[in-house]
Amino acid sequence: LSEKLRALSYSNTPDALPQELARALFQPGGRYVSSMTRLETYRSCPYKYFLQYGLALEARDEGEIQNLDLGNYLHAGLHQFGSTLTRQKRQWRDASDEDIREISSTIAGALSEKMKYGILSSDATSRYTKRSLDRTFRETLTFLRSWSQRSEFDTKDLEKAFFFHLAKEDGETLTISGKIDRFDVKDDAIAIFDYKTGHTEATLAEIVAGLKLQLLTYLLAVEQEHPEEQLLPAALMYIYLSGNVTKVEQVPPNGNVNLSEKDHASGYVLADPSLLKSLDKDAGESDSCLPVRFTNDGSLHKGSASALTKEQ
């Protein structure tokens, strides 16, 4: 009875974690090392951050293909293909149809064997998923080659690791680490790209709120690595590997699997028409990946909200 009476006046007011407990959960090695994904998670939902990164809770692996697995598959494939071109001192625009077909086949074969102990070849449905995924992989490579052929920018680096330190008010240091999927250069101009599976956008409101900070952090990391250079940020963009990559629940009657809409990109670009044309000579046209439009006199359309000045 006394417990029930206490329940009447109970107030579920969350308290801050004791400092020692917080250190044990989030600084097991004595240092706080984080990523922008983690910090974005905290800004979005502190409780989710606590469960995911403090208690290390995760969904039970039931041995099934998840959308995250498919995204990692495509991401790893693009990195390996790009690295192959880099070793050969070639750009994306230099890849032939035969390169895309043969190199992607080799990469896909190796990746599928590593995915959950070869689950992509475990049954007919999974094998259809694999073939559909491989097709999406080839289509994405073709898309990236096409863009590169329209661009004067060259790929400078892939999976570029970075870290920097931020001083906290209590005197300790917060280390931010991460990897930049890809950045391209032309003279002193840089374009930073982050590969995403599915549609992802970063509004200015989300950036100000700390919910979408990856692209800006990548730019900061590149600038800090080249302090002697006056880099010109031409573009900060997400490249969509697929609009809707999902596992195939059952083999369709016609044998075709509709995985995605046309690959494209979103983000922010510098409001410089000539620079944008060097990033994509079709900038402003319907088939361009740059989110801008031009007026008849060649200036940027006022409705091009994704085009910002350098000061912005």
PLM feature spans:
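Structural signature of nuclease core domains in nucleic-acid processing machines
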Residues: 1-312
